[in-house]
Amino acid sequence: IEFIKLCTNNYKCKFFLATGKKYEEQEILKKILNSNFKNFCKALDNLTISETLPIIKICNLAVCNDTSFSHLSAALEVETIVLMTDSPLLYGSYSPKMHPIIPDGETTVTHNTLGKDKINPEKIFNKMKEILKLS
């Protein structure tokens, strides 16, 4: 939510939220959709992959954890910020379209880094500005 706040306070943005159906993912989705930023967001969790891919393709940027969506968006030639929390860095950096962010306090990531609570929204925001050449 902090990243969405940084973006909407500075730029005109729309967020497409592609999540799975796992409980934890749905809880995060609900939290975002019940926040002050709900009007900037569209949930894609009820769409099929084939319905989701064209939406990803038209985005200027994707911000994903290291899941299938990060690999799909990079394959679709969308600049992709990959939030690396528990996977080897190679999984989120093999494409020139992938821009990994690692947890604060870490120099690299591996399986079981357990870094999801240490991803810094400011780092994501600054990387977004760099990729999109925003001031």
Give the ranges of each region predicted by the language model.
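Nucleotide-sugar donor-binding patch of glycosyltransferase catalytic domains
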Residues: 71-134
